[in-house]
Amino acid sequence: MLMPVHFLLLLLLLLGGPRTGLPHKFYKAKPIFSCLNTALSEAEKGQWEDASLLSKRSFHYLRSRDASSGEEEEGKEKKTFPISGARGGARGTRYRYVSQAQPRGKPRQDTAKSPHRTKFTLSLDVPTNIMNLLFNIAKAKNLRAQAAANAHLMAQIGRKK
């Protein structure tokens, strides 16, 4: 039962891995993709038998594979807004996905057309934490240096006696 999953992972690793000097030839990959589809279907059949293991580990991907739940989740994540093209009319209308987190009144700007750059701000906690870590490292180095100096002095005292 677990063999198709390992087989699927091996095929995905071989297909998705970087290749040196060889272009991806997808026109010859039909048998490989059919093997992937059969392995995936066998894995989905086997996952129903192992439902107790899946509920313990909280793998939600395989349990929500029916089409209706996938469409509902996709509908919650993204919305489409029509964008009129340069030609106008129905021929020039394109659709762009806008995530739910963006404001509803303003569709987002294209990043290529945006004149100003995105600014990132850090909270003051991040530099404070970094400085605390650097101070702790410096203290530890100082303590190690003092311990080494003390050990050296103790060795000299021991030689003199």
UniProtKB/Swiss-Prot annotation:
Major location (coarse): secreted
Record-linked InterPro entries: CRF, Urocortin_II/III
Any GO MF annotation of the entry: hormone activity
Modified residues (Isoleucine amide): 157
UniProt propeptide residues: 22-118
GO biological process: adenylate cyclase-activating G protein-coupled receptor signaling pathway; cellular response to hypoxia; cellular response to nutrient levels; digestion; hormone-mediated signaling pathway; positive regulation of insulin secretion; positive regulation of membrane potential; response to corticosterone
Alphabetic keyword roster: Amidation, Hormone, Secreted, Signal
Stretch list, region Disordered: 64-118
Subunit record text: Binds with high affinity to CRF receptors 2-alpha and 2-beta.
Task performed by this protein: Suppresses food intake, delays gastric emptying and decreases heat-induced edema. Might represent an endogenous ligand for maintaining homeostasis after stress.
Descriptive protein name: Urocortin-3
Organism of derivation: Homo sapiens (Human)
Phylogenetic classification of the source organism: Eukaryota, Metazoa, Chordata, Craniata, Vertebrata
Gene symbol of the encoding locus: UCN3
